[in-house]
């Protein structure tokens, strides 16, 4: 994917300000909302099952993140994902720490029934879904990109989703086109809690304005990586890197 495509997608986000429904975890809400606002999108943290499905009909994209799952939140995710699926709207599955507990894996299995447009996770999370084997240290990955590339390709073919594996290097595959390997940004970015969750939200914004899910996902990863690199040049540590990334996304 060219830099021109990434710039075009980012410009479209700014022009159209897509409404992105984020059913995400307590830890990530603030950062995800600020990243979306900075990029030019409109975040909505609507998760209650009494309205999540109805609201999804209004949104340009839905993002379902299982970081802090509970029965009602999972019901809200399922309702929103079902609405998005039936309406042909894009939605992103972020399977946070899916290998940590059987409840998380069961939740992901339930959500996969609604055919996510994109699955974005770290190497361990993607490996768990692809191979049905537990792995990872909670939200952290103990697998490498080399461990997961073939499994990510197979998962993309099997699920019909674009699969994005993020880490020191990012990997994007739809199981058909040549996979993309992109730089992961500043090496301190993993020290910022919930930045990956915010990246999934940014992916939702890009999907809402660009029909090619493979290109939209790659554009989101490129935007975050570039913002991280620019922010890292002036950041003293993860705290300043966090707010500088938001500033860079707003430029």
Predicted stretch roles:
Residues 1-43:
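Glycine-rich phosphate/adenosyl-contacting loop at the front of the ribokinase-like
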Residues 65, 73-122:
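Glycine/small-residue-rich loop that forms an oxyanion/phosphate-binding "nest" at active or ligand-binding sites
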Residues 180-193:
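Short pre-catalytic strand/loop immediately N-terminal to key active-site residues, enriched for Gly-Thr
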Residues 128, 191-222:
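Short, small-residue alpha-helix embedded
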Residues 151-156, 213-228, 246:
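Short, well-structured alpha-helical segments that form the helix of a local strand-helix-strand
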Residues 40, 87-88, 160:
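Glycine-centered short loops/turns at secondary-structure junctions
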Residues 103-179:
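Conserved phosphate/ATP/ADP-binding segment of small-molecule kinases
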Residues 225-251:
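Charged C-terminal helix
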């Amino acid at each position: 994917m060219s830099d021109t495509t990434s710039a075009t997608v980012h410009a479209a986000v700014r022009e159209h300000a897509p409404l992105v429904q984020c059913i995400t975890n307590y830890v990530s809400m603030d950062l995800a909302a600020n990243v979306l606002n900075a990029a030019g999108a409109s975040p909505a943290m609507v998760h209650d099952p009494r309205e999540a499905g109805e609201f999804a009909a209004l949104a340009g994209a839905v993002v379902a993140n299982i970081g802090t799952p509970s029965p009602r939140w999972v019901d809200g995710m399922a309702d929103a994902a079902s609405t998005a699926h039936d309406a042909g709207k894009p939605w992103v599955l972020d399977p946070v720490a899916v290998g940590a507990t059987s409840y998380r894996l069961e939740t992901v299995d339930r959500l996969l029934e609604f055919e996510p447009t994109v699955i974005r996770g770290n190497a361990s999370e993607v490996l768990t879904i692809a191979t049905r084997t537990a792995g990872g240290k909670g939200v952290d990955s103990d697998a490498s990109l080399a461990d997961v590339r073939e499994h990510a390709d197979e998962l993309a073919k099997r699920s019909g989703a674009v699969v994005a594996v993020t880490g020191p290097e990012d990997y994007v595959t739809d199981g058909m086109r040549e996979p993309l390997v992109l730089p992961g940004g500043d090496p301190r970015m993993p020290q910022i809690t919930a930045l990956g969750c915010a990246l999934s939200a940014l992916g939702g914004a890009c999907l809402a304005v660009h029909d090619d899910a493979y290109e939209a996902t790659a554009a989101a990863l490129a935007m975050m990586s570039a913002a991280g690199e620019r922010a890292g040049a002036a950041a003293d540590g993860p705290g300043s890197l966090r707010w500088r990334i938001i500033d860079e996304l707003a430029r």
